[in-house]
Design a protein with these regions (language model features):
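A short, Lys/Arg-rich alpha-helix, primarily the initiator
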Residues: 2-23
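Short, charged recognition helix plus adjacent turn
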Residues: 2-3, 8-9, 63, 73-79
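Residue-level signal for the short linker/turn that defines the boundary of a DNA-recognition helix
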Residues: 16, 26-27, 53-56
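Residues within the helices of the helix-turn-helix
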Residues: 19, 30, 59
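Alpha-helical residues within the helix-turn-helix
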Residues: 23, 34, 63
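Short alpha-helical DNA-recognition segment
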Residues: 26-48
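DNA major-groove recognition helix of helix-turn-helix/homeodomain DNA-binding modules
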Residues: 56-71
């Protein structure tokens, strides 16, 4: 039987992709959280894979980064 990756590592990989994209756009965590109208501590927990990322939240992050959701998910799958 094929093994299935657990959600926790996927959350961490998605968070790492989001962090990388945010940094390449020159945002600090605080500035980006303000940009997308999100509390900085909550946003930081998303990047660290400590919060379960809802699709509506991912949409908000993607909009702020100006990337399609599929780009983040694809990058997280290949990490």
């Amino acid at each position: 039987m094929a093994s299935v990756k657990s959600p926790a590592p996927l959350q961490k990989r998605i968070g790492a992709v989001i962090r990388r994209l945010r940094e390449t756009r020159g945002f600090t965590q605080e500035a980006f959280a303000d940009h997308i109208h999100m509390h900085r501590a909550y946003y930081g927990a998303l990047e660290n894979g400590k919060k379960n990322l809802q699709l509506s939240t991912l949409e908000r992050v993607c909009s702020g980064l100006q990337v399609p959701m599929s780009e983040i998910l694809r990058a997280a799958e290949t990490q």
